[in-house]
């Protein structure tokens, strides 16, 4: 229902313009794009002091406004400051603090899981959590989680514009893990033929579905909003 379908998606009726969810686009209103009340807003309405602690550069980003609104933002770039802001926020009981650190994710995307950079980032986070456990108020529960898993990919598939797979495809969006293909024609025949062509080429490297197949498989939840349907690719290739 929230309509956040991938790293990049095509903005409906924009002439093929893509919205990068992390970099955003000032022409797109975050609260209109993602109108559903957030968990932070619901918690705040219930009387819980909600704080979002993360790097200063994320504070007014479109993604933050779309997904994390409802929390008081505390920007901090150094580990010591992240811990300090978290500790201060937890003294306002009842409280919930969402602390985001992107170092491990960045290292994994750039250098791979298990790389020296990744191990260093993991060690830093381990030390940070250990320090947090010593400094937060007694009785505080700490959950350590991640927004997604990560594996190292051995093969890179690059499809050029002159590739037969691109016939009838006007825009490619999404991300390497799941591509949204927007077609010149939104006919059932075009969707089925494109999905079949891509599946034959990719074989067991990906699962290629038409929009209808993805929806019927509940890949986007049991209820798909009109906005989500409007933004979804006619064909979706999932690694």
Regions found by a protein language model. Give the residues of each.
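Feature captures the catalytic ectodomains and active-site-proximal regions of enzymes
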Residues: 1-239
């Amino acid at each position: 229902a929230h309509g956040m379908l991938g790293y990049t998606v095509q903005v409906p009726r924009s002439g093929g313009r893509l919205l990068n969810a992390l970099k955003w686009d000032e022409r797109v209103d975050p609260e209109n794009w993602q109108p559903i009340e957030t968990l932070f807003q619901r918690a705040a309405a219930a009387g819980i002091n909600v704080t979002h602690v993360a790097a200063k550069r994320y504070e007014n980003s479109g993604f933050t406004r779309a997904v994390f609104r409802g929390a008081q933002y505390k920007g901090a770039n150094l580990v010591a400051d992240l811990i300090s802001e978290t500790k201060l926020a937890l003294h306002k009981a009842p409280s919930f603090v969402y602390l985001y650190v992107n170092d491990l994710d960045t290292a994994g995307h750039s250098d791979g899981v298990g790389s020296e950079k990744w191990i260093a980032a993991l060690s830093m986070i381990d030390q940070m959590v250990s320090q947090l456990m010593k400094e937060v108020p007694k009785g505080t529960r700490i959950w350590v989680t991640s927004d997604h898993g990560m594996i190292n990919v051995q093969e890179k598939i690059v499809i050029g514009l002159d590739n037969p797979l691109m016939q009838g495809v006007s825009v490619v969006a999404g991300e390497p893990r799941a591509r949204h293909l927007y077609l010149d024609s939104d006919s059932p025949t075009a969707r089925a033929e494109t999905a079949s062509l891509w599946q034959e080429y990719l074989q067991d490297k990906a699962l290629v579905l038409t929009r209808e197949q993805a929806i019927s498989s509940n890949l986007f939840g049991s209820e798909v909003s009109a906005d989500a349907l409007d933004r979804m690719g006619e064909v979706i290739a999932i690694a």
